[in-house]
From Swiss-Prot:
Subcellular location: Nucleus
One GO cellular component term: plasma membrane
Protein name as catalogued: Cip1-interacting zinc finger protein
Composition bias type Low complexity, residue spans: 318-327, 355-383, 402-435, 572-584
Function: May regulate the subcellular localization of CIP/WAF1.
Subunit structure and binding partners: Interacts with CIP/WAF1.
Glycyl lysine isopeptide (Lys-Gly) (interchain with G-Cter in SUMO2), cross-linked positions: K280, K340, K401, K549, K588, K680, K705, K830, K879
Transmembrane listed as a keyword: no
Length: 898
């Protein structure tokens, strides 16, 4: 699975690389413009032998057409002055160190491939004169739009931008095979430093012998490792750099990612003539050196090219001395010191605790730089990074001093102010050797005994995890700076000793670079002190979760970059234990991400993002949001009417005797409702003979006893006797004794309603008569599905058909079937034929029955006594005709049934 993932990642990287290649054409125009500016600046500076720089972006070898950066070693000052170094560093840090996580590709270690992006976009440009005034390149110019062009294997995160401080870098990037802790620091911690070195500090190739200035031997360095490859040959010192690929042991390569292998394998294939150093903008250059920690025994000791970039007239003189890669590193004293210096020069980004040591060593460095010019300033930065190793390096620097008398005058030539600035910068980046600007171009003979070299890495492991090379290129206003860059490769023993340290430093994956501060400082030209302060303020961790601090010191013509790896903190995924580095560095420098919702702290941005996506965090966040919304709702104004209605008690309920229900609100409004009117009308007795409503049953009874009613009743009887004999069935005799006690009260309540109700009743009577006539006419033919004459069924605990003279129980359900029968239909037709002379009499008789029923119901309700059994002897006939069939109210129907 892991190999498949690596292959997928490699494929993705290749796809991204192809996209970037397409975008290169667009960027070439911008770079050409920058080149013009640089050429103008170079022309302004004293004419030096131009160093043709063909820079190939860190693209795969499919693009050989891209010129490689060939730094012809000449006495002229190196093209890479402080300003160019600044741009290179800026670009490196803009792109993030994780971009430089180059696969430890199998480099021949003779091809010095370095990402040219670090050269400040000096691609395919022949740099005429190294003496460059500080180019007024705004940070946007420095930042290449498509970073992955130069770093095809850079992760997407690195391309998107450096992660926030404290984000762990890919540990694999720091595990550089076949390198000293210094070189690993060079390569891993900085392909950026290598790029710096290549651009400004052409990484010195270890010279088997210390050739004098401009000597051909120096010009024939065998690029020991891709680091050396990263080092463009400096003038004079490196007339030609032989690129004899020394295959690094495959075990280390096998351990490394296939993507890195591909990158490394591709780049060594591209080899320029030995006289030309390939500076390929491939982050692999750093990775190319086999990891000493992983397989120190298997790894041949790569030769170290000692490059002494000297800005005497702003000329970088690089002594490229070739040591056979297979040759166990016999680091001469110079070689040992120089690798240290290289490491320091490249990026001796030592943790802050090392910075303290640097501060302690700073006075030493100043003294050495001035009184002991013999000691190369590189020794001091190493001493800072290496602690006890400082003394050894300084002592070694003394033989160097002898071998390099030129260095001393150079250091003297540098004004103390510059030294102080350099020291400050060294505190930041600990690139003390570079800090001392050496006026005289001198080739530092590499005479340091190998023993010192081997000792250095182990000590560095303790003091400075992987002695992260710190590169501070301080080009003072006019004093040339001599940058001693020595690719110090330790023998396997030394590698083993320093292996722990190397392991401690994982490769920076997207190392955080405070580019904003760098850009601001470069644009505004902050003081050195401010830059240092700012650099110190920036907490970060080199390697896993470390951030590469880059500060640009801009004074007059030159800028100084200081890259200080802050407290290296191992990532949990990092197999290499970087505990000593973490313990040595102050914990306060590690940036902590804190979640105030969950009260949890995270050591890296990735961990913090993972925490943010956890369901527990989301749940708590939702709870907080809910609470906040509830608080907001509680603060919203509430309408007064709502508050008043809440405070008020519900209105009392009142009983309506007419409707037999409770009602809310005003009595008058209730009486005006349609339901109340219907109930009241149904309860009022109605005389169907006289067509009169009575407010109370008492008045109705009195009316029935009156003579006028009796006369009209006799007339109606005479008419009905002709049709059917027994009209008495329609009359109900009720004992009315005591039924009229509560009538007076009801009369008073109903007086105000009587006028309106009488009018409404008259209209209804007329309407009902019309409807009855229509029904009378409509039932001419029989249909078995139609119920005819339903009105003639009168409920008397059952149903009696007055036409057929049949009775049906209420629960029998036969009333409807009877109405559908043919006999009932024939009888109905006979009845209608008999009623035709006076069709109005039928509704009258029907209403009488219904109204009588209603009157009795009202009497029983008002009196509160159960209805007495109908007494046939008391026949107080109140003949009531049936009303039109309307579904009776449930209340009345239930009472009648019961």
């Amino acid at each position: 699975m892991f190999s498949q993932q690596q292959q997928q990642q490699l494929q993705q990287q290749q796809q991204q690389l192809q996209q970037l290649q397409q975008q290169q054409l667009q960027q070439q125009q911008l770079q050409q413009q920058q080149l013009l500016q640089l050429q103008q600046l170079l022309q302004q500076s004293p004419p030096q032998a131009p160093l043709p720089m063909a820079v190939s972006r860190g693209l795969p070898p499919q693009q050989p057409q891209q010129p490689l950066l060939n730094l012809q070693g000449t006495n002229s000052a190196s093209l890479l002055n402080g300003s160019m170094l600044q741009r290179a560093l800026l670009l490196q840090q803009l792109q993030g160190l994780d971009q430089f996580a180059m696969p430890p590709a199998t480099y021949d270690t003779a091809g010095l491939t370095m990402p040219t992006a670090t050269l400040g976009n000096l691609r395919g440009y022949g740099m005429a004169s190294p003496g460059l005034a500080a180019p007024s390149l705004t940070p946007p110019q420095l930042a290449t739009p498509n970073l992955q062009q130069f770093f095809p294997q850079a992760t997407r995160q690195s391309l998107l931008g450096p992660p926030p401080v404290g984000v762990p870098m890919n540990p694999s990037q720091f595990n550089l095979s076949g390198r000293n802790p210094q070189k690993q620091a060079r390569t891993s911690s900085s392909t950026t430093p290598n790029r710096k070195d290549s651009s400004s500090q052409t990484m010195p190739v270890e010279d088997k012998s210390d050739p004098p200035e401009g000597s051909e031997e120096a010009a024939e360095p065998r690029m020991d490792t891709p680091e050396d490859q990263d080092l463009p040959p400096c003038p004079e010192d490196i007339a030609k750099e032989k690129r004899t690929p020394a295959p690094e042991p495959e075990p280390c390569e096998a351990s490394e990612l296939p993507a890195k292998r591909l990158r490394s394998s591709e780049e060594p294939t591209e080899k320029e003539p030995p006289g030309q150093l390939q500076v390929k903008a491939q982050p692999q250059a750093r990775m190319t050196v086999p990891k000493q920690t992983q397989t120190p025994d298997l790894l041949p000791e790569a030769l170290e090219a000692q490059v002494l970039p000297r800005f005497q007239p702003r000329v970088l003189q690089v002594q490229a001395q070739v040591q056979s890669q297979t040759q166990p590193r016999i680091p001469s004293t110079d070689t040992q010191v120089q690798p240290k210096l290289q490491k320091q020069a490249q990026t001796q980004t030592s943790p802050e605790h090392l910075v303290l040591q640097q501060k302690q060593v700073q006075p030493q460095l100043q003294q050495e730089a001035e009184p002991q010019k013999q000691v190369q300033p590189q020794v001091q930065p190493q001493a800072h990074s290496q602690g006890p190793r400082q003394v050894q390096l300084q002592q070694e620097a003394e033989p160097l001093k002898q071998v390099q008398p030129q260095v001393q005058p150079q250091a003297h030539s540098q004004p103390p102010r510059q030294v102080q600035l350099q020291l400050q910068k060294q505190v930041q980046t600990q690139t003390y050797p570079q800090v001392h600007t050496q006026a005289q171009p001198s080739v530092q003979p590499q005479e340091h005994p190998p023993a010192q070299v081997s000792v250095q890495p182990p000590e560095q492991t303790h003091e400075q995890p992987h002695t992260q090379p710190q590169v501070s290129l301080l080009a003072p206003e006019q004093t040339p700076v001599v940058v001693h860059v020595c690719g110090l490769e330790m023998p396997p023993d030394a590698v083993e000793a320093g292996g722990g340290m190397e392991k401690t430093l994982p490769e920076p994956v997207g190392t955080q670079v405070s580019m904003e501060e760098i850009q601001n400082e470069s644009a505004c030209g902050l003081d050195v002190g401010e830059c240092e302060n700012r650099a110190r303020e920036m907490p970060g961790v080199w390697g896993a979760g470390g951030s590469l601090k880059v500060t640009i010191l801009q004074s007059s013509d030159s800028r100084a970059f200081s890259t200080v790896p802050l407290t290296p903190v191992p990532r949990p995924s990092d197999s290499v234990s970087s505990t000593p580095a973490a313990t040595s560095t102050p914990s306060k420098q590690a940036l902590q991400f804190f979640c105030y919702i969950c009260k949890a702290s995270c050591s890296s941005q990735q961990e913090f993002q993972d925490h943010m996506s956890e369901p527990q965090h989301q749940q708590r966040l939702g709870e907080i949001q809910h609470m906040s919304q509830a608080c907001l709702l509680s603060l919203l104004p509430v309408p007064r009417d709502v508050l008043e209605t809440e405070d008020e008690e519900p209105p009392p309920r009142r009983w309506c005797n007419t409707c037999q229900l409770y009602y809310m609100g005003d009595l008058i409004q209730h009486r005006r409702t349609q339901d109340h009117k219907i109930a009241k009308q149904s309860l009022r007795p109605f005389c169907t003979v006289c067509n009169r409503y009575f407010k109370t049953p008492r008045k109705f009874v009195e009316h029935v006893k009156s003579q006028g009613h009796k006369d009209k009743a006799k007339e109606l009887k005479s008419l009905e006797k002709e049709i059917a004999g027994q009209d008495e069935d329609h009359f109900i005799t009720v004992d009315a004794v005591g039924c009229f006690e509560g009538d007076e009260e009801e009369e008073e309540d109903d007086e105000d309603e009587e006028e309106i109700e009488v009018e409404e009743e008259l209209c209804k009577q007329v309407r009902s008569r019309d409807i009855s006539r229509e029904e009378w006419k409509g039932s001419e033919t029989y249909s078995p599905n139609t119920a005819y004459g339903v009105d003639f069924l009168v409920p008397v605990m059952g149903y009696i058909c007055r036409i057929c003279h049949k009775f049906y129980h209420s629960n029998s359900g036969a009333q409807l079937s009877h109405c559908k029968s043919l006999g009932h239909f024939e009888n109905l037709q006979k009845y209608k034929a008999a009623k035709n002379p006076s069709p109005t009499t039928r509704p009258v008789s029907r209403r009488c029955a219904i109204n009588a029923r209603n009157a009795l119901t009202a009497l029983f309700t008002s009196s509160g006594r159960p209805p007495s059994q109908p007494n046939t002897q008391d026949k107080t006939p109140s003949k009531v005709t049936a009303r039109p069939s309307q579904p009776p109210l449930p209340r009345r129907s239930t009472r009648l049934k019961t």
